[in-house]
UniProtKB/Swiss-Prot annotation:
This is Hemoglobin subunit alpha. Heterotetramer of two alpha chains and two beta chains. Gene3D superfamilies: Globins (1.10.490.10). It comes from the Eukaryota. One of its GO terms (molecular function) is oxygen carrier activity. Pfam families: Globin. Residues 2-142 form the Globin domain. Red blood cells. Keywords: Heme, Iron, Metal-binding, Oxygen transport, Transport.
Length: 142
């Protein structure tokens, strides 16, 4: 997935609104994913799945921090996400469809917290970015 200059600018603009809320937004995205797609819980058998649990908040922060790094290195997503790609493919063996589930939940979080900023163009750019991230994260599966 090729991101245009406009896409990159749009992603950086909307992501700037999340930069102070990485843990909060990350936890919310994970909670939504676990609720909407309960099969994703299989990768977290040791987690306390209750609302606002410390484990979900900590992992949500990790997820959104990784996305933050990807935004900061938007011109080199494979380089920025190489370690995570290998981890998820070889060690954790996460089913690739789960990245799409999480991407959808990330979009929902932005829609809830920043409805006026998430114009159709920004929404499309953020979706393309999350698809590009998913493609990189699944690239080591092949």
């Amino acid at each position: 997935m090729v991101l245009s200059m406009e896409d990159k600018s749009n992603v950086k603009a909307i992501w700037g609104k999340a930069s102070g809320h990485l843990e909060e937004y990350g936890a919310e995205a994970l909670e939504r994913m676990f609720c909407a797609y309960p099969q994703t819980k299989i990768y977290f058998p040791h987690f306390d799945m209750s609302h606002n649990s410390a484990q979900i908040r900590a992992h949500g922060k990790k997820v959104f921090s990784a996305l933050h790094e990807a935004v900061n290195h938007i011109d080199d997503l494979p380089g920025a996400l190489c370690r995570l790609s290998e981890l998820h493919a070889h060690s954790l063996r996460v089913d690739p469809v789960n990245f799409k589930f999480l991407a959808h939940c990330v979009l929902v979080v932005f829609a809830i917290h920043h409805p006026s900023a998430l114009s159709p163009e920004i929404h499309a750019s953020l979706d393309k970015f999350l698809c590009a991230v998913s493609a990189v994260l699944t690239s080591k599966y092949r």
